[in-house]
Amino acid sequence: MTKHKQILIGLLVIITIIFVGIGIYSQNLPKKLYPGEVLEYEGQDLSLINDFRENSIKGPQQIKESTYSLTITGLVNQTIEFSYDEIINEFQKYQKVTTLHCVEGWSVTILWEGFLLEEILEKAEISSDSEVVIFYAYDGYSTSLPLDYIRNQEIILAYKMNELILPPERGFPFQLVAESKYGYKWIKWITEIELSNDLSYKGYWETRGFSNDASIK
């Protein structure tokens, strides 16, 4: 081996050690707490908002409150559109501590605050033929859940987490809290909700082999 090659190999080893060290150091840094974020609720410890990992299909979406609208379509007696303020001011608010489990193996327990999804959907007068609720997001993501599940589990559409308005990276203006389902059902940046009877509908990850049921076993 020539002296030149030995020097190159030595430099590569040093660079590798430096990058590994940086990675270990960054993993051990304390995670930033959002100003005003609560870490405990009624005796239960909560995860940090920054404990979430970024795994959206196109990165965090920036949606303006002033131009946002949520449309309810499909098997309803009337298509209806809500502004952000209309949802915030018209519907009863609920809180619940729920854990999101990701298929990647991590989980977070958060205090969510929002609105019963069923109450929002009923404003459009749900047709008796409706069986499935399909959700569409600003970034092109979609997923679906049975209407009975949404009713029976009292699923909420969250606008706050740990007492703070959802930050853009966590789904502002609204994130679905699909408790007992894996994280890919917890759709963020929702812009349209469609009532359907298409039991075979599959969303973004479901068409790529993920379970359409997504129940945590």
Where do the PLM segments sit?
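Stable alpha-helical elements in mature extracytoplasmic
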Residues: 68, 80, 113-116, 120, ...
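Short, flexible micro-motifs
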Residues: 77, 108, 117, 174, ...
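A mature extracytoplasmic/lumenal domain signature
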Residues: 74-76, 86, 104-106, 114, ...
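Mid-length scaffold segments of soluble, non-membrane domains
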Residues: 92-145
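A glycine-rich, hydrophobic loop/mini-helix early in the fold
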Residues: 60-108
